[in-house]
Amino acid sequence: MNFQPLGKRILVKRLEEMKTTASGIIIPDNAKEKPLNGEVAAVSKEIEDVKVNDKVMFAKYGGTEIKLDNEEYLVLNIEDVLGIIK
């Protein structure tokens, strides 16, 4: 993947959502909400606080979905990042 975000943006790969409940009930794809956390895949040169491979939590309606190398990613403004998961 060769993508460099511009401005104050980062590229995030959403973390896999849970496909079953704790009691074993399978959740269909159309009933699942997209996860609000992911792993940072690329960072613009203007961002210092977030690094590649950091796990971040972001706002529900933030970002733009894109597809690179048959993988789905989210381009987020840094203001939409709520925090780094440690």
From Swiss-Prot:
Subunit: Heptamer of 7 subunits arranged in a ring. Interacts with the chaperonin GroEL.
Localisation per UniProt entry: Cytoplasm
Described purpose of this protein according to its UniProt entry: Together with the chaperonin GroEL, plays an essential role in assisting protein folding. The GroEL-GroES system forms a nano-cage that allows encapsulation of the non-native substrate proteins and provides a physical environment optimized to promote and accelerate protein folding. GroES binds to the apical surface of the GroEL ring, thereby capping the opening of the GroEL channel.
Record bears the keyword Cytoplasm: yes
Family from the record: Belongs to the GroES chaperonin family.
GO-annotated molecular function: ATP binding; metal ion binding; protein folding chaperone; protein-folding chaperone binding; unfolded protein binding
Name by which UniProt lists this protein: Co-chaperonin GroES
NCBIfam families: PRK00364.3-3
Record-linked Pfam families: Cpn10
Gene Ontology terms: biological process: chaperone cofactor-dependent protein refolding
Keywords for this protein: Chaperone, Cytoplasm
Keyword Cytoplasm: yes
Upper classification of the organism: Bacteria, Pseudomonadati, Campylobacterota, Epsilonproteobacteria, Campylobacterales
Main location group: cytoplasm
SUPFAM superfamilies: GroES-like
PANTHER family named among the record's database cross-references: 10 KDA HEAT SHOCK PROTEIN, CO-CHAPERONIN GROES
UniProt GO cellular component terms: cytoplasm
